[in-house]
Each structure stands twice: as structure tokens, then as C-alpha cells.
Amino acid sequence: SAASDVYKRQNFAQYLNMLDHCTMITGRRDLYKTNGEDVNQQIDEIKSTMGNNHPKVLFIRTAASSVKAKGSAGSVCGEMLSDLGCVNIADSDKSMLDDLSLESIVAADPDYIFVTTQGNDTQAAMKSINNLLTDNAAWNSLRAVKEGKYYVLDKKLYNIKPNARWGTAYKQLADILKQ
């Protein structure tokens, strides 16, 4: 849409900027407070509970035809994980962004693995990741897998955009990371 071309909303700061402009245009500054400032305060409170823990994470977006690691920049979940103090293994191994291999994942051995789907066919998207990664015996050697820290996340919150649910999205991730 035209609005999405003008307003990038990959992270909460960009969402706040868009909300600021839209509520100025509409004259509904009360909505900026409710949906912007109040949510920003909620997110800041969540971030303040994270302490000095900086877990290594892998964030994967899977679709029917592809499985891609995503870095901290340019994806909703990647940016949130970074905000929460995580170290994304794809940030230090850029080859993962182009060619995700189980060998590189095993070498980095992340503490957590997060997956979100893309597209309408969630079943086909999960089949893609199973074929590439999870069906391989080496997958089960990963610390995150052994410790039950492999999570499939809601694409509406972590791939598309959480919009009014930014606070919820941050809280769910923080709760997982504090387990």
C-alpha cells in the first residue's frame, strides 16, 4: 500500500514515528498517547527486566519455498530480539543470511531458536524447515533443541507487524527468554 511505502514499520521506533504523523493529521493525539507513549513505556519496562543476559539466538523465517535466517536489522522479530539484549548469530555470520546451513547453526550452537512462517500455507512452510533442518539428526545435537528452546512464533506478531500489540509481542519474547 502507499502508506507502507512511505512509512517503514520494521521496529517500534518506526511505528511510533508513523503513529505520530497519523495522529497529528487526524487530530487524535489521545491515540498517540494510548497506542504510542503508553506502549513505549510498557516496552521499556519489559526491557528493564532483562538484566545482563545476552543469549545467542537464531531467528528463521520459513515459507513454502524458502528457509532464511534473519539478522537483527530489517525484520520485526530480529529487531525485537536485539532490543531485548539477544545476540543474533546471523549478525556475525552473514553467510547464514544467504545460505542457511545446519553446519553453521551447529557451529554457533544458539541458546534459543525462533521460527516464524511467511505466506498463507503454514503447513508447507513448516515442511520446508523440517526438510532442511529439523529432520536432520544433527539438529537434535543443538543445545536449544535439547533444552526445549525452539519456538515457532505467531507470524502476526513477529513477521507481519504487531501494530497495536507491540507490548504483547515484546512481553511474550521476554517471558520466553527469562525461562
Named regions from a protein language model:
Residues 1, 12, 16-23, 36, ...:
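Extracytoplasmic/secreted envelope proteins and their assembly/folding machinery
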Residues 8-15, 28-32, 36, 70-74, ...:
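Solvent-exposed, acidic/flexible segments
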Residues 13-27, 115-179:
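Structured C-terminal subdomain patch of bacterial secreted/periplasmic proteins
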Residues 31-84:
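Basic- and aromatic-lined ligand-binding clefts that recognize polyanionic substrates
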